[in-house]
UniProtKB/Swiss-Prot annotation:
Domain of life: Bacteria
Signal peptide annotation: 1-37
Induction: Expression is induced in vitro in the presence of phosphatidylcholine.
Coiled coil (UniProt feature): none
Gene Ontology CC annotation, any one: extracellular region
Keyword annotations: Cell wall, Hydrolase, Secreted, Signal, Virulence
Localization of this protein: Secreted, Cell wall
Function: Involved in virulence. Induces cytotoxic effects on mouse macrophage cell lines, via direct or indirect enzymatic hydrolysis of cell membrane phospholipids. Hydrolyzes phosphatidylcholine.
Post-translational modification: Predicted to be exported by the Tat system. The position of the signal peptide cleavage has not been experimentally proven.
Protein name listed in UniProt: Phospholipase C D
Catalysed reaction equations from the record: a 1,2-diacyl-sn-glycero-3-phosphocholine + H2O = phosphocholine + a 1,2-diacyl-sn-glycerol + H(+)
Enzyme Commission no: 3.1.4.3
Source organism (scientific name): Mycobacterium tuberculosis (strain CDC 1551 / Oshkosh)
């Protein structure tokens, strides 16, 4: 394939379409992403081969929920009593303290509303996730949901998808590297986890505007005062930007907190780096222009609009399109792509079940428990001081010429691991990171395969734009209602059969630094 064309469209035409129309324009001509990317040159076997790190965060999915059936992972073939959760009876379709529900498939092809694709939004609050975790026993998922969700929606947390339902996600897992021990940072909702993604803390001691334990309807503005990773990067002379989608106006940042930098007092100065690089850049227009002009910064945080975020009840297909969209942009400039690592992660599990019990800090561990005097005065706390994390497992892809798949990494990571990757690569320390968290999580260098030359050949990733187009209109009623806990419930099948994992492909383990 010509290096100047993507899917039959020239680089310049493609970038112009992205800048002019965003996702809507792209959907009109979406095709196979790239059948073959461009040669990335000889491998030197060093992390320094990677000059650009792009962090792309989606919303609210657990690892078992997406990849419990994926081959080579700690998934449904694992022998564990935790797959049998008590609290709902599939036979009677009712709450039942002794009833057992196992993971069951959300079939995205059934029904006029595709209710398997657009399911109700589970409770994923600080309280609900701590109650699900249940002191590390991890056996209280259904009773925790029953406190805030209707009876018919309570078992939603046990639903999962297969390759048939989210084909693009599975093809990405086959083409690159997947982490099956990547945990969200907080046993709680979106905003606390995104704060960890940017700064490695929620200010549990309450010294600088925290602690933040909930996700308010409106994003806080200049409320927090602790140091964030972009400030450390600026001080070290390492370029960075936060690219956020603005195509839907204020709605673009609903649920995803795309303007997160403005939550910090340091952003009050319009001349500051935080405003110039953390507020002004847009996605996809500014990002696409920077890629084409060879001025992509060393570090990019990218936040798509809420309709592409995968937040329930938005369909996963729309999120697949968003991931492929950012890949198209990077591939439009081979000189940039060959030196780039794209890490796609999910802010938190969204309330969806995962059988792996996360590591958590012992009581009293500095920085890992809320220590303000009156915990009941902290919004969303429910009187719970912690542990803060780790939270539950979420999907994570490492997409790069240096992470060719199918590969699987079993090392433990969380959102602060992305920041530690920058620390290792550029020598810029992560602010606020606790000694405990540093001791239990890695820096993600093990996700790269530097022992072999980089491989840029790509599979055909289907037609995600067209797939999203066919799904979204049918999901509109349930997507709108499901986001506010009023969607059409998905009936739990009876009798239940424990799902199994795929047997192929076989997944290798990357070399890491060599």
């Amino acid at each position: 394939m010509s290096q100047s064309h993507i899917g039959g469209v020239s680089r310049r035409e493609f970038l112009a379409k992205v800048a002019a129309g965003g996702a809507g324009a792209l959907m009109s001509f979406a095709g196979p992403v790239i059948e073959k990317a461009y040669g990335a040159g000889p491998c030197s076997g060093h992390l320094t081969d990677i000059e650009h790190f792009v962090f792309f965060m989606q919303e609210n999915r657990s690892f078992d929920h997406y990849f419990g059936t994926l081959s080579g992972t700690d998934g449904f073939n694992t022998v564990s009593p935790l797959f049998q959760q008590k609290g709902w009876n599939p036979m009677t379709q009712a709450l039942d303290a002794t009833g057992v529900t196992m993971p069951y498939r959300f079939d995205t092809t059934r029904g006029p509303f595709l209710d398997g694709a657009c399911v109700n939004d589970p409770d994923h609050s600080w309280v609900a996730m701590h109650e699900s975790w249940n002191g590390g026993v991890n056996d209280n998922w259904l009773p925790a949901q029953a406190k805030t969700r209707s009876a018919a929606h309570t078992p939603t947390v046990m639903g999962y998808y297969t390759r048939q339902d989210i084909p693009i996600h599975y093809l990405l897992a086959d083409a690159f590297t997947v982490c099956d021990r990547y945990f969200c940072s907080v046993l709680g909702p979106t905003l606390p986890n995104r704060l960890y993604w940017l700064s490695a803390t929620i200010d549990p001691d309450g010294q600088n505007g925290g602690p933040e334990l909930q996700s308010p309807t409106f994003q806080p503005v200049r409320r927090f005062g602790w140091r964030i990773m972009p400030q450390n990067l600026s001080d070290a002379g390492v370029s960075w930007k936060v690219y956020r989608n603005k195509t839907l106006g204020p709605i673009s940042s609903v649920l995803t907190y795309g303007s997160l930098v403005t939550s910090f007092k340091q952003s009050a100065d319009p001349r500051s780096d935080l405003v110039r690089f953390g507020v002004a850049p847009s996605y996809p227009a500014s990002f696409a222009a920077d890629v084409l002009a060879n001025r992509l910064p060393r570090v990019s945080w990218v936040i798509p609009n809420v309709l592409e975020s995968e937040h329930p009840a938005v369909p996963a297909a729309a999120g697949a399109f968003a991931i492929v969209n950012i890949l198209r942009i990077l591939l439009a400039n081979p000189a940039v792509w060959e030196k780039t690592a794209l890490i796609v992660s999910y802010d938190e599990n969204g309330g969806f079940f995962d059988h792996v019990v996360p590591a958590t800090a012992p009581a009293g561990t500095p920085g890992e428990y809320v220590t303000v005097p009156d915990i009941d005065q902290v919004p969303g706390s429910g009187g719970i001081r912690g542990p803060i994390g780790l939270g539950f497992r979420v999907p994570c892809f490492v997409i790069s010429p240096y992470s060719r798949g199918p590969q699987m990494v079993h090392d433990t990571f969380d959102h602060t691991s992305q920041l530690r990757l920058l620390e290792t690569r550029f020598g810029v320390p992560v602010p606020n990171l606790t000694a405990w968290r540093r001791s239990v999580t890695g820096d993600m260098t093990s996700t790269f395969n530097f022992a072999v030359p980089p491989n840029s050949s790509w599979p055909n990733l289907d037609y995600p734009g067209l797939h999203a187009l066919s799904t979204v209109p049918q999901c509109v009623p349930n997507a709108a209602l499901g986001t506010i806990n009023r969607g059409i419930p998905y009936r739990v099948p009876d009798p239940q059969i424990m799902p199994t994992q795929e047997t192929t492909p076989t997944r290798g383990i990357p070399s890491g630094p060599c």
